[in-house]
Each structure stands twice: as C-alpha cells, then as structure tokens.
Swiss-Prot record:
Keyword annotations: mRNA processing, mRNA splicing, Nucleus, Repeat, Spliceosome, WD repeat
Coiled-coil boundaries: none
Gene that encodes the chain: prp5
Biological processes per GO annotation: mRNA cis splicing, via spliceosome; mRNA splicing, via spliceosome
Biological role stated in the UniProt entry: Required for both cell cycle progression at G2/M and pre-mRNA splicing. Interacts genetically with the PRP4 kinase.
Organism: Schizosaccharomyces pombe (strain 972 / ATCC 24843)
Pfam families the record matches: WD40 (PF00400)
SMART domains with a match to the protein in the record: WD40
Claim: Cell membrane is one of the keywords in the record: no
SUPFAM superfamilies assigned: WD40 repeat-like
Subunit structure: Belongs to the 40S cdc5-associated complex (or cwf complex), a spliceosome sub-complex reminiscent of a late-stage spliceosome composed of the U2, U5 and U6 snRNAs and at least brr2, cdc5, cwf2/prp3, cwf3/syf1, cwf4/syf3, cwf5/ecm2, spp42/cwf6, cwf7/spf27, cwf8, cwf9, cwf10, cwf11, cwf12, prp45/cwf13, cwf14, cwf15, cwf16, cwf17, cwf18, cwf19, cwf20, cwf21, cwf22, cwf23, cwf24, cwf25, cwf26, cyp7/cwf27, cwf28, cwf29/ist3, lea1, msl1, prp5/cwf1, prp10, prp12/sap130, prp17, prp22, sap61, sap62, sap114, sap145, slu7, smb1, smd1, smd3, smf1, smg1 and syf2.
Family: Belongs to the WD repeat PRL1/PRL2 family.
Name of this chain's protein: Pre-mRNA-splicing factor prp5
GO cellular component: catalytic step 2 spliceosome; nucleus; post-mRNA release spliceosomal complex; Prp19 complex; spliceosomal complex
Length: 473
C-alpha cells in the first residue's frame, strides 16, 4: 500500500514538471536565441555627468547645494550647472544636458523627483542635487600681518648688590629710579640713569615677591613669602601699614591705576582686594584651585586678571567680586601676565605657550610660538615690543601685532655663579619703553637698551615667512 502511494506521488510531480516546461516553451520559445537590445544611453550620460560634477565641479563652477545634515547655505547654480529635462509620460526619453553659455543662469536646482523617475539611477548620483561637496568649499586662510622691523636689544648695564635671587621689580612713575626685591629679604632702590644704589629697605623676614610704587602717593607697597603685605612711606623710609589676611605666601601685588585699591594674590589660591587707606579686605576673589602666580590690574572692566597654577586665567568683576570669564586654553601653570599699555589686550605666559588675548570677554587672538621654556615674565612697551624671559635664561623679543619673534638672546651668568643660575624671574620696561630691566637668578639686575643707529639693513630681524597652514589652537 505504501509503495503504491509513493508511485502515485512521483507521477504527480512528473506531471507538474512537464506542464511547467510546456508552458515556458509556449511563452518564450519563439524568442529563444535572439539578442535582447538595451539602450544604456541614459545610464552612460548620468554616469558621465556625475563624474564631471564630482571631479571638475570646483573648476567648472558646478552646483553647490545645501547639505542636509550640516545646514550649509544654498548657493546659486553657476554658468556650468547641470539640469534634467524630464518627460513624465516617457521617462526613457529623459536626457541630461549641460549649459555652455556662461551668461545663462538657471533659477533653481536639480530636481530630485526628476532623477528618481530615471530607471537605475545609483544612490551616489543623487548627491548631484541638494548636497554640497565639502571638497568644493574654499576655506580662506587667516589674515597674516607682516611684522614691523624693530631695533635689536643689547646689554647696557649689570647691577650687583643683592645676596639672593632677584624676584621682582617696579619703576617709579617719574622714571628716576626703580626698586627690586630679592631672596635676601631686602628691597633696594636704584638710580635708573646710573645704576647706583640709593636705598635699602629691610623689614620682611622672607623672600620679597612683589613691589608696586604708587603714582599718586609717596608710597611703596611690597609683599613676600612671609604672608605680609607692607606699605612703605618713602618720605620716612618706614612701614606705615600692614595688610593682614593671606594664609600663605603672597606672590603678586598690583595697584589700581585710578582707585586707592591694592590687589594681592598668593599661595592660598585667592586674590585679595584691599582698601589702601583703611587696610580693610574689600573682596576675596576665590575660585582658583591652586596658587595664584600672576596678576594684572587695569582701569576698565574686567579690572582684575589672575593667572594660576591650575592652568586657568580668570577675569574678575571688581565691583561684585565675582568671576566674569574663565580661560582654560593653557595646559600648564600661568606664570606671567602683561597688559598692553595702549591697547585693550594682554598676554599670558606659560611653559606650553605665550598667548594673546583681547578684552573684555577674553577673546583668544593667537599664540606667540617659539619660546620653548618655562616663561616666568612678560613685558610690553608702547612700541609693540613684547619681551619674554624664561627660567633657563633665554630671552625672546616679539612683534606684538604679528606675533613674530624677531630676536633671541641668552642671559650670561655673572662670574662665580652656576650656569643653572641663568633664570629670569621678573622684568619691566621703564616709562619710556627704551630700557628693559630684568631680575635674574645670578643675583644681578641687568638693563638692556636698543642698538643705537640701527637700521633694517645693518641689523635685520630674524627672518619671517608667512605660513600656509591653517592653525588650530
């Protein structure tokens, strides 16, 4: 019984197969062996058009549309743009044409619906319409300023007298004398013209780290690692006020140019604002996570700028005592800050770079590249010359406008000092900007001046070449 059932099933399958073959012969037998003709003109034209647009679009002025995901603006289709003539009734008759008349404009863009009507259009070809090619977008280089020529600087005088590292300097507003503070716990006042010692002030019990001469009072302010901030009366050469409040060493001190306000900063990670006359602590500017190593004060908001060992720079609202902006571009300790005397700009120095900033929001302007050392001090004069001094004794002079390093010098240690004592800790231009005072680790104070009768022909600066690179900071 089982064998009979299997024979019946096989007969049914054979019958079905035979019927299928007979049907296929009836349908297709008449065309067996004939060659099927296929007109691929449309496909070839589309392929050629797509490759022209992709490879030569930037030269021929091809269509640059709007990229959906990047929100690029739509551009007008140029004289060599491509278009599609579509016939809805007969899609196979559609052709792609190219306008060669340079004066003829096309209002609109290639229709995606028209392309979709063409059979066999590859997905890549759809980029012709509605999507711009990133390679076709011309990116302009940042404008590069040609540096101005500056006369080179040379050593004018070496002043000895301190018994420790010289850590700070300030020039008297009348430009007659300057003062320095050192690791020997003394403050010395020197005649600027002759370099002769005029006075030595003693009172600090640790290294003197900051000095400031008041432009409106006969006062000299000093701070040191002994946590003390002192006010000296230069008529009696004695301390008349102490400002108590810092919990650790005080590393920086600045006076407000128009207000009777004193700002100090130090190892306790805060900057303190003092009333000069009443000795009251007006504000405690807190927010830094580590030692505040540098400080700058100006007349206009933001009136206080601080740089810290936490690698940040903060711009402060002096009236409210709060942070306006925090700049996080530096990756190392910000050891130096310097304001431009005539512009609303400033510079910051660190071991990773020297950076150029613009007030009031702290906009980043660029880098001064080339001083590969730990920069301890920066100074800027009215002639757009910036000086940077480092812990290895290297000195660089920069053109402020272009950021070009036009001169390099190496400080020479004094006889009896080690080569490792070539570090530069502080610097300042005098009020004319023609003399530069540096404080160094070999216990000396050096004064530099520009070379007399220098010309671009006799004393050319370091060569400058414009860069073709797009800089990313």
């Amino acid at each position: 019984m089982t064998e009979a059932k299997n024979i019946s099933d096989d007969t049914d399958v054979l019958s079905l197969t035979t019927n299928s073959l007979r049907t296929s012969k009836t349908l297709f037998g008449a065309e067996f062996g004939s060659v099927t003709s296929f007109d691929d003109t449309v496909a070839q034209n589309l392929k050629r058009t797509y490759k022209e647009h992709l490879e030569y679009g930037s030269v021929l002025g091809g269509t640059v549309g709007k990229r959906k995901n990047r929100h690029y603006e739509e551009d007008t289709i140029g004289s060599n743009a491509l278009t599609v003539r579509a016939d809805s009734e007969n899609p196979s008759s559609q052709v792609i044409t190219k306008f060669s008349d340079p004066n003829k404009k096309i209002a609109g863009q290639v229709s995606m619906q028209s392309l979709e009507k063409i059979k066999g259009v590859p997905e890549a070809a759809h980029r012709i319409a509605g999507e711009s090619q990133a390679s076709l977008v011309k990116r302009t280089l940042a404008e590069q300023i040609r540096p101005e020529w500056h006369a080179p600087w040379t050593l004018m005088r070496v002043i000895s007298g301190h018994l420790g590292w010289v850590r700070c300097v300030d020039v008297e507003p009348g430009n007659q004398w300057f003062c320095t503070g050192a690791g020997d716990r003394t403050i010395k006042i020197w005649d600027l013209a002759s370099g002769v010692l005029k006075l030595t002030l003693t009172g600090h019990i640790a290294t003197v780290r900051g000095l400031a001469v008041s432009p409106r009072h006969p006062y000299l302010f000093s701070c040191g690692e002994d946590k003390m901030v002192k006010c000296w009366d230069l008529e009696t050469n004695k301390v008349i006020r102490h400002y108590h409040g810092h919990l650790s060493g005080v590393y920086a001190l600045k006076l407000h140019p128009t207000l009777d306000v004193l700002v100090t900063a130090g190892r306790d990670a805060v900057a303190r604002v003092w009333d000069m006359r009443t000795r009251q602590n007006v504000h405690v500017l807190s927010g830094h996570k580590s030692t505040v190593a540098s400080l700058a004060v100006q007349e206009f908001d933001p009136q206080v700028v601080t740089g810290s060992m936490d690698s940040t720079i903060r711009l402060w609202d002096l009236a409210a005592g709060k942070t306006l902006t925090t700049l996080t571009h530096h990756k190392k300790t910000v050891r130096a800050l310097s304001l431009h005397p005539d512009e609303f700009t400033f510079a910051s120095g660190s071991s990773d770079n020297i950076k150029h900033w613009k007030f009031p929001e702290g906009a980043f302007m660029g880098n001064f590249e080339g001083h590969n050392a730990i920069v301890n001090t920066l100074s800027i004069n009215s002639d757009n010359v910036m000086f940077s001094g480092a812990d290895n004794g290297s000195m660089c002079f920069w053109d402020w406008k272009s950021g070009h390093k036009y001169q390099e010098l190496q400080s020479v240690v004094q006889p009896g000092s080690l080569d490792s004592e070539a570090g530069i800790f502080a610097s300042s231009f005098d009020k004319t900007g023609l003399r530069l005072i540096t404080c160094e680790a070999d216990k000396s104070v050096k004064i530099y001046k520009q070379v007399d009768n220098a010309t671009p022909e006799t004393h050319p600066n370091l060569p400058w070449t414009p860069s073709n690179l797009r800089r990313r900071y």
